[in-house]
Amino acid sequence: MFDRKTIAAFIIFAVMTMGGCGSSSSNFLSENDRMIQAMTLEEKVGQLFIIRPEHLNRTVSADYIHYHLTSWDTVLTDEMKDTLSKYPVGGFALFARNLDTHEQVKQFTADLGAACEIPPFMALDEEGGRVRRIGRKFSADVEQIGTMQSIGDTGDPQNAYNAAYTIGGYVKEYGFNLDFAPVADVNTNPDNIVIGDRAFGSDPELVSSMVSAYIDGLHAQGVMATLKHFPGHGDTTNDTHTGYSAVYKTWDEILQVELIPFVDNFDKTEMVMTAHITMPNVTSDDLPATLSHEIMTGKLRDELGYNGVLITDSMEMGAIIQNYPHTEVVIMAIEAGNDIVLLPYDYVASFNAVVDAVK
């Protein structure tokens, strides 16, 4: 359960950060194998998680962080370093409230990276449009990118490339190496409240070409990409951030529309992010796609042939925390086929649960 994720993570990180070193692929894989063999069980388990910095703050409970926190971490304290030494992680996801000043963000990302034995993913949601952590916080200092729908409406993939190139340039400047973008959803439902103008449009072929160009733009700046939200969040009416959401299409129908931008770009992206949507006409278990072995392994891995890194959407979202025990659901996600668990509700408890499950 660890080797596939760890190897994939090391490879994509090396490709994006060490591409000019000139070492052969076989030599790199040999070195990578040695690194994995030298890792402790705890280090391997840590690579399964991307967390928020607040998860390192053990002075407050997970419930407090989720429901009551008003002051978010903007510096790495000695106490947080101590937690990190005991509970290593694969990466961090920062939000607008972790961003204070230009220099603070650069220092914070640098300090988080330096505190990890294994170089971490430094991630954020910077899609452009209404989802932009840095763009919103530092709106006067970075170029503002319009909605993906407005870019899709131009019909020119070069505009998607330009947007991503701009975004990749400034997120890299602030110390990030992974963007949870682009949105590969096809917006086929006019009542969709969570995707809407975050998608490039309702034509799957157009969306696919825009997504491809967007990934190229990020890559040109040395930033990794994430296709989201598999198997497609475009035909929903409810928001998985707040609760249950379902897509009632059959698998054949989804193959003809929603999956086209994903399948077309599997070979370009570093990661695919799952959706917490249920698909009652596809699965027999009625589980959210994130937790469904039928979808994540049976459909995505086996049928569609995706062999890259698979990351969950945030496990703090309503569709998850309202329906499943916080640590049990992490095990379910890993068993379904996910390689990285994003934002577990209680990181330390989840970490310990995985260690215990392996032992």
Task: Name each model feature, range by range.
Residues 3-11:
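Sec-dependent signal peptide recognition
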Residues 17-20:
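C-terminal motif of bacterial Sec signal peptides marking the signal peptidase cleavage site
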Residues 22-24:
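Bacterial signal peptide processing site
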Residues 31-58, 81, 85:
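Mature N-terminal segment immediately following signal peptide/propeptide cleavage
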Residues 35-40, 64-79, 98-120, 130-132, ...:
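Second-shell residues forming the walls of enzyme active-site clefts
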Residues 54-55, 124-132, 136-137, 177-187, ...:
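Short glycine-enriched loops at secondary-structure junctions
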Residues 78-95, 165-178:
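Catalytic domains of carbohydrate-active enzymes, especially glycoside hydrolases
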Residues 146-176, 181-215, 219:
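A substrate-binding/cap region within the structured catalytic cores of diverse enzymes
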